[in-house]
Amino acid sequence: MTKLKHEVAVPAAALIHPTLMLTGRSASAVYVQPAAQLRRLANAGAIIKIAHGYYVAIPVDKRKGDWLPSLETLTAGLATAIYGQGNGALWGLSAARVHGALPRAIATGFALGPSQHRPLALAVRPGEVHFRMRDPERLEVEYLSTELGPGLVTSIEQTILDLSGQEFVSDSEPRVEAVRNLMAMANADRLAELAARVRGRAALARARKLLANAH
């Protein structure tokens, strides 16, 4: 167990391996009354409630500061907590943020997994996380390292196709900025091959048109 302030410890067995995420279900492996114990840990500053039913253990080296993970990190943690390790991933604008293609902050996190899940309002910052039912095994995803543990994120090329799945409405929407920046990062051959494999040729055509219109 890791010692935190006020001599309160978060049992490793209560965490959702291999992350710092906790839920009532994961805490029940240690506590008879998990809800009460999670409240105790939160009141002691050992964990943070990030959404209804979901908590994060504060790392030892962050316990004295105002530590708060980014929206993308929280989204990745929730995806793993809900779907299990290797079954949830960041996609869409969240993936674009991770890849550095969307500098401006957004208020919504986007995650995918093998089943549908209701949106979760965040308790620690304005915003919410939306979930989409998609099988990550059918997508091109990459390993993602976060403060809360390992996760997955759609590749640059997959993110381009995802964000270009619908017509672009105006240049002011964040998808436009994200796709233009991602196209500059992408491997053209890999993108074309992926588009052919996942029936994304129409999406690729939109992305190419968007890039051409920018010049």
Feature locations, PLM:
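Detector for methionine-enriched segments
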Residues: 1, 21, 133, 183-185
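Short gly/ser-rich loop at a beta-strand->alpha-helix junction or flexible surface loop bordering the NTP-binding
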Residues: 18-25, 35-142
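N-terminal low-hydrophobic presequence detector
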Residues: 1, 5, 60-61, 68, ...
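Hydrophobic alpha-helical interaction segments
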Residues: 108, 136-215
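Alpha-helical residues within the helix-turn-helix
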Residues: 29
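Short amphipathic alpha-helical interface segments
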Residues: 2-26
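Exposed alpha-helical structural elements
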Residues: 10-11, 37, 69-78, 94, ...
